Amino acid sequence: MVLAGYENRAAWQDAPDGRVLLAAVTALAEAMPPACNYYYSPNATAAAVISHHARGGLPAATMPPPALERAVTHVASWSRPLMDEEAGCDWLHRWDTNGAQLATWGVKLGIGDPEHVMSPRWVPKKSKYTAGYWLVSIEGGWRPDMRLPDLLGPWRRAGEPQIWVTTPFLELLADDLAAPVSIAEAWLWPQSSAWLEAAGHSFRDARAALGARADGCGRCEWCIALRVDKDRYTRATGNCARRRTGDAATAAADPLQREDANDHIIDKALAIDYRRQLRTGKATGRWPVAIFNDAVYYTSDLPDGNQAIPASMTLGTGLGQYSHETTIPLDAVAGELGGRGFHRAVERYLRGTR
């Protein structure tokens, strides 16, 4: 069911006529499993797809205080001053990571009731399979590589020596970076499951099938269906952490009211991007100067984004590959790098108001 005249949450209104609209609805339906047709909104359709793959019923889970209180601060925006070798570059390029969050729908999520554990021990290469929240401090003045996104930003914003982090974020700190973490307590699920993975595969397969025929015009049936597919899975992640309304029992009974899924997916995507940026820096000597959600900025002497991309990053439409978003003169925003106004400065430049 598509109410195109009223639908402002998906791309149906971009169809130039009824023929293209019908073709787009049909294309999306054919790219998805049976009984997963579009219905009413991206959120409602995504919920139906997830439920379709959980034929035995979606696993229920009790949300611990850090999830309910939205205690986790995500590293979503960062920039740094230029290094000497970057200051002489002419151009600043932005690439977006394709399907960054969809690629993490296989993350382990809790089932049932979490346990409150005091002074838990993180076991390298093992604890990463335990979904949960950890109250963590960093000992000994440790600092991450200053050429990469600032992983200590959440501590500074909180103004506290201890903050709550998810398992994927702690895995990045403890296993990948060997940070000297100290854990005061945790809420951990003894049982966990990658229960979003099957639905993620359906969205991924639809994305690949539709993307293979979309030409980027934004008005044909394939482009419209592809954008609707993306709307579904991106909104589904945010919808897990939607504001709770009504009584607590009603919210708790909704199997897709899952703040933990939102937190774990976002942090898993961040960790994957961080590891990739670290590998790129070591392999090529080129380091990001900024990130904004799933987008990353690099400097270059080359004006063409397809040629300027670091050698270890792959342009393409697949999950985890990169799409070039924009290129601007570096000197237009260089003075804002390292400050809070950088991303606004970029958008003002692109709008022609700077």
Model-found features: residue ranges?
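Conserved acidic
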Residues: 1-354
